[in-house]
């Protein structure tokens, strides 16, 4: 099965120039990609992994999901050749001296488990530093397989794979972006490079669609968490770090793992607006300022609105924040809503926001219907 693809994005083909010294990213090819506003479903922090690959002779498959940009050291060689920060396979060969070239069908593949199943809006196949050893073309397929399947189970004949990115030429040392229009919920991807070569990073942008049965079994859960389907809709300032960090799993591990704004020189304040998993009852709030010591928010408040046209209602009044501290608040009564907003005064940052509660009856019904509609 093949999904329709939007081909209006900038595309790159052909070799990059050999590295000539200096900043290796100086001639890196990239473009503005509209889907990068969505969460990276292949984020290791969400639990993503590269579960198998048919070949990783020169560089390991796990490099595909490293969160930082690929690095390049022109002097770093190992026993198998140049050490590259990505997934790189050996050069394919034909079957005989008369046919030394790989066939049209030859390719290498890697299986990726998404950290959070969801609807994919765009994919970036990044060939940073693979200037003459990138694949001629790539393709990407998606599947929805329940549970924790093994590589053998994913490769079984009865697994239905949907083409998300048809076989498409790519460029070396470039961020090759592809819009995806398949309205389905996927759990796994199969990345193919034709016929061989190297890919530095893979990013899979989309909307998380959580399993409603799992959330129902939990009872009380974080209704704004990224892994449960919460989203950042807007923010006043993203100067130092993305607002999505505030709804990532776990505690912040360092200062830039949270959200920090530039210094304000006016009388305003900074804020983030979120869309909850669906309509929810919020009973408790956590605001964490971990690792924000001289730059944490001075005060914070939380508001909720019920529906797109609803009015904002403050459920946590402006409250003093302490640096590098997790603040917990039990609400006097449950706050019902579909959206939430945190305001910080006057600027600074928070590392995490947690809104603990449960779906309302109609919210749970809508989530279950969407999950079923998307093939979950």
Curated annotation (Swiss-Prot):
Q: Which reaction does it catalyse?
A: allantoate + H2O = (S)-ureidoglycolate + urea
Instruction: Indicate whether Nucleotide-binding appears among the record's keywords.
Output: no
Q: A biological process (GO) annotation for this entry? A: purine nucleobase metabolic process
One Gene Ontology term of the molecular function aspect = allantoicase activity
Q: Which InterPro entries match?
A: Allantoicase, Allantoicase_dom, Galactose-bd-like_sf
Report the top EC class in one word: hydrolase
Q: What is its EC number?
A: 3.5.3.4
Q: Name one Pfam family in it.
A: Allantoicase
Q: Which HAMAP family match?
A: Allantoicase
Q: Which family does it belong to?
A: Belongs to the allantoicase family.
Put simply, this protein is called Probable allantoicase
Report the source organism. Answer: Streptomyces coelicolor (strain ATCC BAA-471 / A3(2) / M145)
What does UniProt list as this organism's lineage?
Answer: Bacteria, Bacillati, Actinomycetota, Actinomycetes, Kitasatosporales
> What is the gene name?
alc
């Amino acid at each position: 099965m093949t999904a329709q693809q939007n081909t209006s994005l900038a595309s790159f083909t052909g070799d990059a120039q050999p590295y000539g010294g200096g900043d290796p990213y100086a001639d890196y090819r990239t473009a503005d990609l509209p889907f990068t506003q969505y969460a990276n479903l292949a984020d290791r922090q969400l639990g993503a992994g590269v579960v198998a690959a048919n070949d990783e002779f020169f560089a390991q498959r796990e490099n595909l999901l490293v969160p930082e940009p690929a690095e390049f050291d022109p002097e770093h060689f190992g026993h198998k050749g140049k050490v590259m920060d990505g997934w790189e396979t050996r050069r394919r060969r034909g079957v005989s001296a008369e046919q030394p070239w790989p066939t049209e069908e030859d390719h290498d593949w890697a299986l990726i488990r998404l950290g959070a199943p969801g609807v994919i809006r765009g994919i970036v196949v990044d060939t940073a530093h693979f200037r003459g050893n990138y694949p001629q073309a790539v393709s990407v397929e998606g599947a929805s397989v329940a549970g924790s399947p093994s590589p053998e189970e994913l490769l079984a004949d009865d697994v239905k794979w949907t083409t998300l990115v048809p076989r498409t030429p790519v460029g070396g040392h470039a961020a090759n972006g592809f819009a995806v229009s398949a309205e389905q919920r996927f759990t796994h991807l199969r990345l193919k490079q034709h016929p061989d070569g190297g890919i530095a990073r893979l990013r899979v942008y989309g909307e998380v669609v959580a399993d409603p049965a799992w959330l129902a079994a939990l009872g009380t859960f974080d209704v704004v968490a990224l892994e449960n389907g919460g989203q950042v809709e807007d923010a006043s300032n993203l100067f130092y770090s993305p607002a999505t960090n505030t709804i990532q799993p776990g505690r912040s591990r360092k200062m830039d793992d949270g959200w920090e704004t530039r210094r304000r020189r006016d009388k305003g304040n900074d804020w983030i607006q979120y869309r909850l998993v669906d309509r929810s009852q919020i009973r408790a709030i956590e605001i964490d300022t971990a690792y924000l010591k001289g730059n944490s928010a001075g005060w914070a408040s939380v508001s909720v609105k019920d529906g797109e046209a609803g009015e904002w209602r403050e459920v946590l009044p402006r409250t003093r924040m302490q640096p590098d501290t997790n603040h917990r608040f039990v609400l006097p009564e449950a706050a019902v809503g579909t959206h939430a907003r945190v305001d910080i005064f006057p600027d600074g940052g928070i590392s995490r926001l947690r809104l603990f509660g449960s779906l309302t009856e109609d919210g749970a019904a809508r989530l279950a219907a969407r999950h079923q509609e998307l093939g979950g």
